[in-house]
Amino acid sequence: MSAIVTPAALGALMSGTAPHAVLDLRERAAYERGHIYWTTSLPRRLLETRLPGLVTARSTPIVLIDEDGSLSELARPTLAAMGYTDVGVLAGGLGAWRAENRSTVQGLNVPSKVFGERALHEWKTPQVSCPDLAKRIAGGDDMVIVDSRTPEEYHRGCIPGAWSMPGGELVLRIGELVKRPDQTIIVHCGGRTRSYIGAESLRRMGLPNPIIALENGTMGWQLAGLELERGAERWAPPPSSRGRAVAAEVAKRIVKSDGLRGVTAAQVRDMQGRRAVENLYVFDVRTTEEYAAGHPAGAVWAPGGQAVQAIDDYLAVRGAQIVFACDDGSRAALSTAWYKRLGFPNIAYLEGGLPAWTAAGGDVESGHPVPAVWGLDAARAGVATVAPGALGDAVVVSVDPSDVYLRAHVPGAAWICRSRLETRIGGVAPDRARAVVVTCADGAQSTLAAATLGRLGYSSVRVLAGGVRAWQGAGQPVETGATRLADEADDIVLKPYERGRAAMEAYLRWEEALDMEGRSPHALLPGTSATR
């Protein structure tokens, strides 16, 4: 692939079947405002942490995108140093793409939202409006309401009386709540997608119960003037032996009807041995507690509902081999079925799950592994540190995420997004001989940033040892708020419900009208960062 990729060449690459990755290096708010459909949001500052897991094969063709190509050119040497051998830059960036009247889309996780709307229309998912559900709750209707989002989202605010049951757990656990065939099951989320996918997962079970999705979820509930329940703790009950047997039977039926492929533990281990030359994702779709207790070595935690809700957060190479794993194969098979309907060509589930993996001699890891940061050790060897305490007249620069900076930073610290450090540092420290101290929460991102400043010619750069956490631990004072932003805080995007009524209304209009290419006649409100 050419080092400079024209818009036409990128369009041809993305419409083909050869494995490739297209990485948008801008920050999340800029990506939300407009991006090329099916590209992966990977802010430049996260390359060292996330890229090895997103693109495992170093020979994969990779195209870097930003607004005008300048950020991509800054990032290209990093990828080369990491061993990626086929890296191109979109000539002229998104500006050139748009100049040729090529389309862009708004929003985050757009492929998943498109799929949710497709599910609604193709399978005609039954729906209930928020006012109607409120009336049914007030009238004491016999029904079970489940929230298919993450436990954290559920706890922040759910439909009154709802149980937490993330989408990937519905088929396994719904029988623990529903005791009669005439009980209505209501599935809700924050908006639309996860309600529809969750309801359709239950409908595939063949239950006699009425299964209905709540139209517009918790946002619709609030827009209707209704109050959410805050701090609920009705967690999904553990699955019984009967529930497991039912889920296994449903999975067996879906495997046959959908023509799904199972792979053995030995086959997965062979794939893992080739992951440096053939892209591979192994996703464990169970709960966080189950994953932490023990999972196949190398598997990434991707709970089933979120793996469908946020596809582009988990993978960057659509042609890669994807393997789903769980404890007995049932939840993994259901995730595989959804990805097949999404059009992924190389998908499979681990037959027999974790027990089969361990029986075959596969290594098991526990906890949630902290991703290695490429280049961090080398950067540490080349930069000096300073202990918490008096920093003298040094210029203090924070490269934390902006929301972390707002919560606590060293007094006087200027905030710069690390993705744009080279182009912003001159406004904060124009004298390259001046002492500079770089900070972040724990010292990792600041170490990488300090190494960059050294390459730029800053001769007296140090890193705050242990980061702001160590600073606070030493009893030093901190500042809060946007005291000295030296860059646009576009790295954090608030949810529509965090932005207010107008943002929620705009979001729901936008999502409902999405076409199969991620386009909508309705616009989202401009993305907002944590500073607003």
Residue ranges and their predicted role:
Residues 1-21, 25-144, 148-281, 285-395, ...:
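Rhodanese-like catalytic fold shared by cysteine-dependent sulfurtransferases
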